[in-house]
Amino acid sequence: RDGKPVIAGDFAIDGVPGTGARITLYFLEPGGSKTGKLLPTGNVQDTITLSDGRTIQVSLVDAANPAVFVKATDLGYEGTELPAFTETDGGVLLNTLEDIRTTAAVMMGFAPSKEAASPAVPKVCMVSAPQTYVASDGRTIKGNSIDIVARTKALAVMHKAYAVTGGICTATAALITGTVANEVVSERAKETNQVTLAHPSGKFDFEICLTNDTGWHVEKAGVARTARPIMKGIAYVKGE
């Protein structure tokens, strides 16, 4: 307004303090951000073997940020567990997700072995069908208001909310026919390409423009955010 960014507003983001003006960000052509392929293995699902001998189905997707997806039910979880859950389960969930993540790192070509995998790439996400649950702040998130429930790691702990790029990858994966995320996402999302993702702190809305004329392709991904000033300073440039 008047040549200056509008900061004040009533738009709120679950997991982010305060409110602000709604700013829609569009990520153009986010597919293959690090691997060069939307589906790094060429498959919508792959079978992997965990360290304990179990075999599970996963989907490897690279959109804005590469990630591996697994169904919560395939690991014996509901999918609505909050980060505090991992403080009382003896590290089982975190260790299992890390096992999956490092296996995917090798499959995506990021590391020669699981032991050499970066702690940050790829991400690992546990997904489940829409269901009612209580968020970290005590609010009830209704199952009919969301399209998919997801949980992800932030390095060595469970993420308290959900990262933007991770959300774009999750929403994209949910709309690619045949992925494990697509098998649990709502029919509403498949019809509208609008995905409301439920995380520990609440909900996150995404708009995915996806085509499949000659293979899956993401034209753009939209997400609403807010902005605020965080610093003000003066840079001094030496004159001639």
Regions found by a protein language model. Give the residues of each.
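Non-transmembrane, aqueous-exposed alpha-helical and coiled segments at domain scale
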Residues: R1-E240
